[in-house]
């Protein structure tokens, strides 16, 4: 499964490089200045759009396959976060500025556990005020103290194009099991 994921990643990179190569090609220097606010040549943008559409479609397919494999019953938010609330918790919902402590397990969509609170310690962060991934902030605001949930976080809400610089490469969706302390 790991080699399949790497192959998909390599294909995505090749598509992006192909699009970049053709998007940057110029037929000749005209000496004319172009306005930064106007798009005069739509042909230069189309390869980027097409490459991005392919990448987004493949990522969505991977997410759906993962959800089916684990038989999670998920709801999708407007941003693309998928969440299965196992226990909403008690008290007030978390909001911006609240401190959260949670146990977690973070893994790739091939099932490989990347980080977990048993080995890496609990996550302690302030909602919407820390460098935790955007998808986790969004999910926590749907829960209360003591809440538990399964999450599938698309790459744009996780570690983005660059990855985390350690164990997660760029453009990878991640899944999390979280349990918030009371």
Task: List the predicted regions and their residue ranges.
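Sec-dependent signal peptide hydrophobic core
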Residues: 9-16
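Cross-family detector of peptidyl-prolyl cis-trans isomerase
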Residues: 2, 6-9, 24-182
């Amino acid at each position: 499964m790991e080699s399949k994921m790497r192959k998909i990643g390599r294909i995505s990179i090749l598509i992006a490089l192909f699009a970049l190569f053709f998007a940057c090609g110029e037929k000749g220097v005209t000496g004319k200045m172009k306005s930064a606010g106007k798009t005069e040549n739509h042909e230069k943008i189309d390869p980027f759009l097409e490459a991005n559409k392919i990448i987004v479609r493949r990522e969505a397919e991977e997410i759906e396959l993962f959800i089916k494999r684990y038989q999670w019953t998920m709801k999708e938010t407007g941003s693309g976060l998928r969440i299965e609330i196992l226990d909403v918790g008690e008290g007030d919902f978390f909001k911006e500025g609240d401190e959260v402590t949670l146990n977690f397990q973070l893994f790739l969509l091939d099932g490989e556990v990347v980080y977990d609170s048993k080995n890496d310690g609990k996550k302690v962060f302030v909602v919407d005020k820390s460098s935790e991934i955007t998808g986790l902030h969004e999910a926590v605001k749907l829960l209360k103290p003591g809440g538990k949930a399964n999450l599938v976080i698309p790459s744009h809400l996780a570690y983005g194009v660059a990855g985390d610089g350690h164990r997660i490469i760029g453009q990878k969706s991640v899944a999390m099991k979280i349990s918030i302390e009371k």
